[in-house]
């Protein structure tokens, strides 16, 4: 079963982090992604740039509306996603617990409903 691990955490100003903290974070995520890959459960992984680089788009009454910043103004920001292919929710929970972001934010687990592969939508359940 495919699960998305959605990473949410407060985004500190990069200037408040030491070089050592940044390197520790990169190393932790590298080790985590490597463990997922070595276990054969990693579909893909993306860590997003900060919310300062976000742009939100909507179409209201046929008119394009573009806004700087994220869609929602929340304390925690959506910061990344890991797509896993594991046996069940318990396996996804075990991997979410090991995610470095779980130590300073939240890892939301959501099962995939459908995916687009080879030109067609396919059920993932």
Language model: regions and residue ranges:
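Conserved, structured core segments of small domains
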Residues: 1-125
């Amino acid at each position: 079963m495919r699960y998305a691990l959605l990473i949410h955490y407060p985004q500190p100003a990069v200037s408040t982090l030491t070089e050592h903290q940044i390197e520790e974070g990169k190393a932790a995520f590298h080790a985590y992604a490597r463990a997922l890959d070595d276990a054969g459960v990693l579909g893909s992984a993306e860590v997003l740039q900060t919310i300062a680089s976000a742009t939100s788009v909507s179409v209201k009454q046929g008119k394009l509306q573009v806004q700087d910043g994220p869609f929602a103004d929340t304390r925690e920001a959506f910061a990344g996603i890991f797509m896993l292919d594991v046996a069940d929710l318990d396996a996804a929970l075990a991997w979410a617990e090991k995610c470095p972001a779980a130590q300073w934010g939240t890892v939301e687990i959501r099962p995939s409903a459908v995916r687009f592969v080879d030109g067609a939508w396919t059920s993932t359940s």
